[in-house]
């Protein structure tokens, strides 16, 4: 996977709507080439590459955690209300402040994190079992989606701006916007790595994990917070980017097995490579028209989702 990620990095760096030779790109990287090339590479392509890497890592680790602690192989940030919370906050902000498009990332982050805290409280009040987390998330998602639909009916003029956010994309992202999300994603990844042995025991079942000394409710709650914080961080700069948190954990487990300490780095690498490749394809295949990475991920993820559903029915 490291080789695939490196290849993805090179493709993202050298390909774009503006054609440049490899020599031009390398000179621009070091600030010694033509000014227009330096701007394209250093101000546009590099921040976008970093955003794609962070989005891939954040959503993949979030999905892996959610699938591990809930015991549901279809769990993802979408299902526990993170994306719905972000979407509701975004459309509410647009309805109250129609010109505040620049505030959408911040509002989305607050909405996603508020949804996370609510899910944690709900799950904790009913002993944070893996079933209660999923049910609480589904209920919250349904309520928030109803709220989004209601606001859309009352304020139809906000639909266009909201749709741009809900599709998910990395166009126009800057390095400054990535600082806080990067810190949250790295901290979540580090804490997950520390808790990997206990998460692996949690995958054996609550009773067996408890008999082995794992504080089941505490570990599940911490993992839920890490997963949601990581996903919320991605939402703040990439919008509602779907399917990554669903499909990448399955790819990682097929490559290295289900042990969390092996699946975690594999998921991070796979997710980073997948989103980076998807974004590169989206901005180059139909150049100069750009296809948002959210659409590319949906084209890849929807068939994969159907395969998972069919596989689950056969196992059932």
Regions found by a protein language model. Name each.
Residues 1-316:
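Alpha-helical transmembrane segments in inner-membrane proteins
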């Amino acid at each position: 996977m490291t080789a695939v990620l490196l290849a993805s990095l090179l493709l993202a760096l050298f390909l774009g709507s503006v054609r440049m030779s490899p020599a031009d790109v390398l000179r621009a990287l070091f600030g010694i080439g033509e000014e227009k090339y330096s701007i394209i590479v250093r101000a546009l392509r590099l921040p976008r590459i970093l955003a794609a890497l962070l989005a891939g890592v954040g959503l993949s680790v979030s999905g892996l955690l959610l699938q591990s602690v809930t015991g549901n192989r279809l769990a993802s940030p979408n299902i526990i209300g993170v994306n719905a919370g972000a979407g509701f906050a975004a459309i509410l902000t647009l309805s109250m402040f129609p010109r505040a498009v620049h505030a959408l990332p911040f509002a989305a982050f607050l909405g996603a994190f508020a949804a996370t805290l609510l899910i944690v409280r709900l799950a904790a009040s009913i002993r944070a079992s893996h079933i209660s987390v999923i049910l609480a998330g589904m209920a919250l998602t349904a309520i928030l989606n109803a709220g989004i639909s209601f606001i859309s009916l009352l304020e139809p003029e906000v639909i266009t701006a909201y749709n741009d956010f809900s599709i998910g994309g990395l166009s126009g992202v800057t390095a400054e916007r990535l600082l806080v999300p990067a810190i949250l994603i790295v901290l979540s990844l580090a804490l997950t790595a520390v808790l990997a042995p206990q998460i692996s025991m949690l995958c054996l079942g609550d009773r067996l994990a408890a008999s082995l000394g794992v504080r089941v409710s505490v570990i599940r709650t911490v993992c839920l917070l890490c997963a949601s914080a990581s996903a919320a961080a991605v939402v703040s700069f990439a919008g509602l980017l779907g399917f990554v948190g669903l499909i990448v954990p399955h790819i990682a487990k097929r490559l290295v097995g289900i042990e969390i300490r092996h699946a975690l780095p594999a998921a991070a690498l796979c997710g980073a490579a997948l989103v980076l490749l998807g974004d590169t394809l989206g901005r180059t295949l139909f150049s100069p028209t750009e296809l948002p990475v959210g659409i590319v991920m949906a084209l890849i993820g929807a068939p994969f989702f159907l395969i998972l559903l069919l596989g689950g029915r056969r196992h059932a």
